[in-house]
């Protein structure tokens, strides 16, 4: 497959040490050579070499650059690729790009370089999606999962499962078309059932990693809830190590939702500091309280903050009811003051959920809280070096659909349905798994996926 030659700025816009303009396509080297001036021509350069020179426009030097030449097929796109390393900035870099476009290159669409890598067989679709996961990774663990997926861990597993299904379908066809025994139908059903159970077990095992994988990829929507002035904003500031929320002794200071990402021992949290939940006549505060209730309902995880220096109130107990059904940690704050809280009642309300004591003004208890969060979600098993995690929502949905199709095969065999009918569900499972790797996928989906990438990627 051959495309036109595309160009784009691959580094973020703005001032910086360097900026990279990337070209890919059959004319990439020739187009770059038209504007690059040095001792030797780029057209004669060997692959994977770097060259110093200048970019000129109408005889005027507009940039001093280093140019990398990479010839097909040993490139990311499997096309000729040129990367121009210029000084970071806006004006000169855009002039270089415009010069390339005037000399025959077309401006790349978002994600077009990665899309070409997929279409040219350099990577499959799950590996292409992992590129974006790596870019967006917020923790070392999320980065590790993305790198393993880019390396083909998930692809190899899916392809092995598809091969198992294909082998079974081929055997079904042989047994139907060339029966040698009277009991061929029974033998075929038994073989098909064994293969189905094998593939189904693997799909179920993959889906068991989905919850942790999704956490790593997207982060946990974490609502910090509690009555006014119990220390919610102090907790947010301590976790992100930055003064984002106003902290005062005046109840009701936080009137809107504040969101921040933080990495807590490998667990990515999207922290949501909510307005204190209480009955109020203040119109503005009332809006904040309603938003807090919605944030609580939508949260994946809750940090329920109580003031250890005050007695438990009806409003506090109502928060436990609202948190029911969620994963949550109870934070008993202000341990530097006299304890007035009924701790036994708190333990009764919290049930199996962890309870951590803190004195945020004295920086005490934060490590214990971070450890409780890590243990609650990962319990250490996420660290397996070669583990394959499913984190992409699209992949998870396709695996669930494939599992449903495989269950249909099992049910059909158990009901005594003919194998040529049962194999329809088997073929559907094969197709669905193929959508994960891109072996069977619609062009519209490809456009939708790659448009999520930035320009130059």
Curated annotation (Swiss-Prot):
GTP binds at residues 229-234, 248-254, 273-276. The keyword Nucleotide-binding applies. (6S)-5-formyl-5,6,7,8-tetrahydrofolate binds at residues 22, 83, 122, 457. It is an enzyme of class 3 (hydrolase). PROSITE patterns: G_TRME. One of its GO terms (biological process) is tRNA wobble uridine modification. The keyword Ubl conjugation does not apply. K(+) binds at residues 229, 248, 250, 253. Mg(2+) binds at residues 233, 254. Residues 219-378 form the TrmE-type G domain. It holds the Pfam family MMR_HSR1. Its cofactor is K(+). It is found in: Cytoplasm. Keywords: Cytoplasm, GTP-binding, Hydrolase, Magnesium, Metal-binding, Nucleotide-binding, Potassium, tRNA processing. Its EC number is 3.6.-.-. InterPro entries: G_TrmE, GTP-bd, GTP-bd_TrmE_N, GTPase_MnmE, MnmE_dom2, MnmE_helical, P-loop_NTPase, Small_GTP-bd. Binds 1 potassium ion per subunit. GO terms for molecular function: GTP binding; GTPase activity; metal ion binding. Homodimer. Heterotetramer of two MnmE and two MnmG subunits. Exhibits a very high intrinsic GTPase hydrolysis rate. Involved in the addition of a carboxymethylaminomethyl (cmnm) group at the wobble position (U34) of certain tRNAs, forming tRNA-cmnm(5)s(2)U34. Belongs to the TRAFAC class TrmE-Era-EngA-EngB-Septin-like GTPase superfamily. TrmE GTPase family. PANTHER family: TRNA MODIFICATION GTPASE GTPBP3, TRNA MODIFICATION GTPASE GTPBP3, MITOCHONDRIAL. This is tRNA modification GTPase MnmE. It comes from Listeria monocytogenes serotype 4b (strain F2365).
């Amino acid at each position: 497959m051959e495309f036109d030659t595309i160009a784009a700025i691959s580094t973020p816009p703005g001032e910086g040490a360097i900026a990279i303009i990337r070209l890919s396509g059959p004319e990439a080297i020739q187009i770059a050579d038209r504007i690059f001036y040095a001792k030797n021509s780029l057209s004669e350069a060997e692959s994977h070499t770097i060259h110093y020179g200048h970019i000129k426009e109408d005889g005027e030097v507009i940039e001093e650059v280093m140019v990398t030449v990479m010839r097909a097929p040993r490139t990311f796109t499997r096309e000729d690729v040129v990367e121009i390393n210029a000084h970071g900035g806006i004006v000169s870099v855009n002039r270089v790009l415009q010069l390339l476009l005037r000399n025959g290159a077309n401006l790349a669409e978002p994600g077009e370089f990665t899309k070409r890598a997929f279409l040219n067989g350099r990577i499959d679709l799950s590996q292409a999606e992992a590129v974006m996961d790596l870019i967006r990774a917020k923790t070392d663990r999320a980065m590790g999962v993305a790198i393993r997926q880019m390396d083909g861990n998930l692809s190899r597993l899916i392809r092995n499962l598809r091969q198992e299904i294909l082998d079974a379908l081929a055997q079904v066809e042989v047994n139907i078309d060339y029966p040698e025994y009277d009991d061929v139908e029974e033998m075929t059903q038994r073989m098909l059932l064994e293969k189905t159970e094998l593939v189904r077990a693997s799909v179920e095992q993959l889906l068991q990693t989905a919850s942790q994988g999704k956490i790593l990829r997207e982060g946990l929507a974490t609502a910090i809830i509690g009555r006014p002035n119990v220390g919610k904003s102090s907790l947010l500031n301590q976790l992100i190590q930055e003064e984002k929320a106003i902290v005062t002794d005046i109840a009701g200071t936080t009137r809107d939702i504040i969101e921040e990402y933080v990495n807590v021992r490998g667990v990515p949290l999207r922290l949501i500091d909510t307005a204190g939940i209480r009955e109020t006549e203040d119109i503005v505060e009332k809006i904040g309280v309603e938003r807090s209730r919605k944030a609580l309902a939508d949260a994946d995880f809750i940090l329920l903050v109580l003031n250890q220096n005050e007695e438990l109130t009806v409003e506090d107990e109502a928060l436990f009811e609202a948190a029911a059904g969620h994963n949550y940690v109870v934070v008993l704050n202000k341990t530097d003051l006299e304890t007035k809280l009924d701790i036994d009642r708190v333990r009764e309300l919290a049930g199996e959920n962890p309870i951590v004591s803190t004195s945020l003004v004295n920086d005490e208890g934060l490590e214990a809280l971070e450890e409780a969060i890590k243990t609650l979600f990962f319990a250490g098993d996420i660290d397996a070096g070669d583990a394959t995690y499913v984190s992409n929502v699209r992949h998870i949905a396709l695996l669930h659909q494939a599992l449903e199709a495989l269950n249909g095969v099992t049910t059909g065999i158990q009901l005594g349905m003919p194998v040529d009918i049962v194999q329809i569900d088997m073929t559907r499972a094969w197709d669905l798994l193929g959508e994960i790797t891109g072996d069977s996928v619609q062009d519209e989906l490809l456009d939708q996926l790659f448009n999520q990438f930035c320009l130059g990627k």
